[in-house]
Amino acid sequence: MMFLWWLLLLGTAISHKVHSQEQPLLEEDTAPADNLDVLEKAKGILIRSFLEGFQEGQQINRDLPDAMEMIYKRQHPGKRFQEEIEKRQHPGKRDLEDLQLSKRQHPGRRYLEDMEKRQHPGKREEGDWSRGYLTDDSGYLDLFSDVSKRQHPGKRVPDPFFIKRQHPGKRGIEEEDDTEFENSKEVGKRQHPGKRYDPCEGPNAYNCNSGNLQLDSVEEGWAA
């Protein structure tokens, strides 16, 4: 709109200049009065257009808060502009409030929670066991006793505290002795009663001494 008024003013000025050059000298006294009237009219029109545009802009700015307030009132109190805020945020920063809450927690528990989330679903129970062992020894003992009850009576896992109290160099020897003793029992049970070999001649001579041989002979006599 402003551009059109400026074009009109420019065209009027150009036409006035051309017309003044073509008029004779006798009409020079009357021509300036007419030109001044035209310029005054154009000036009034331009000023009026400026004022109207300024008033329209003020009215728009005045109506904009009212429209925003109406939209704000129509929305749910807990969901106002929530979607727009989430869209404007970075995808990796939308959980900023959760991150602030996690910072208030204990540093050691924060690491355990992250580990549980990253672990396989079937291995999270192991993480709980380790956390219970670190925080509470009584909980660890209860869990260990529960595991030992589920196992076979002859194959229960030995107590780790008992193993730690032993000498490091003697743990393997005692385990080997127990294994050889059990293997010899199994071999004796699988053989024929009348064909069982002498303990001193077998692969595992665990009781090859005179006292044990006499005791075995007495037991066989009583059995006969």
UniProtKB/Swiss-Prot annotation:
InterPro entries, sorted: TRH
Modified residues (Pyrrolidone carboxylic acid): 75, 89, 105, 119, 151, 166, 191
Molecular function, one GO term: thyrotropin-releasing hormone activity
Region annotation (Disordered) ranges: 86-131, 150-212
Signal peptide positions on this chain: 1-15
Additional detail: This precursor contains seven copies of thyroliberin.
Family membership noted in the UniProt record: Belongs to the TRH family.
Name by which UniProt lists this protein: Pro-thyrotropin-releasing hormone-B
Organism: Xenopus laevis (African clawed frog)
Lineage: Eukaryota, Metazoa, Chordata, Craniata, Vertebrata
Recorded name of the encoding gene: trh-b
